[in-house]
């Protein structure tokens, strides 16, 4: 299993293929609906995503003894970000998009053009993902958007994912759908 460490280098990302399991370690930032809309509307994102990771996640986070503790951090459905993701990939230089359920052809094309991949995280395992968060380093837009929509900065350790859309234009979701249709046709 390949280990991806922040900063995520383009040459490493371009070496990944759809279907390959990976673990992600280092800085991973969250962003979901409010984040993407804010970006699309020209809002200033206060962090640099170049060679970084964006996790579609609305975590449950509590403050204990003056520090943030991540209780749950499951992926949220990525398809909602389809209208925004190609531009975000192009403009930010992000290398990893992490979520669940896949994204559209425009995002796949942006991944291929700009050296990015879409990683499928395990849905329904928010406690498992939270256990991979060593530290919540910081948070942006907490007061404005609330904890679930805020942009969190997590220090992750061995976060398991699968390359679902690679930088060569291959989508695991499309491959599985095609194989399923072929199998169905053979049954008829």
Which residue stretches match the model-derived regions?
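Structured core elements
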Residues: 3, 23, 54, 162-164
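Feature captures the catalytic cores and cofactor-binding loops of soluble hydro-lyases/lyases
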Residues: 30-159
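Short, surface-exposed secondary-structure edge patches
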Residues: 10-15
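Active-site/ligand-binding-proximal alpha/beta "capping" segment
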Residues: 85-87, 163-188
């Amino acid at each position: 299993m390949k280990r991806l460490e922040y900063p995520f280098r383009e040459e490493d990302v371009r070496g990944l293929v759809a279907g390959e399991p990976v673990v992600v370690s280092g800085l991973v930032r969250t962003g979901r609906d409010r984040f993407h809309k804010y970006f699309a509307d020209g809002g200033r994102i206060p962090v640099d995503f170049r060679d970084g990771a964006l996790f579609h996640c609305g975590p449950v986070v509590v403050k204990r003894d003056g520090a943030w503790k991540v209780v749950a951090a499951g992926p949220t459905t990525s398809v909602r970000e389809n209208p925004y993701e190609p531009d975000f990939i192009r403009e930010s230089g992000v290398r990893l998009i992490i979520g669940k359920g896949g994204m559209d052809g425009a995002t796949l094309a942006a991944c291929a053009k700009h050296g990015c991949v879409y990683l499928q995280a395990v849905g329904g395992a928010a406690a498992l993902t939270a256990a991979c968060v060593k530290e919540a380093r910081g948070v942006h837009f907490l007061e404005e958007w609330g904890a679930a929509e805020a942009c969190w900065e997590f220090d992750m350790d061995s976060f398991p994912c699968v390359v679902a859309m690679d930088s060569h234009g291959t989508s695991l979701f499309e491959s599985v759908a095609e194989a399923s249709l072929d199998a169905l046709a053979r049954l008829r």
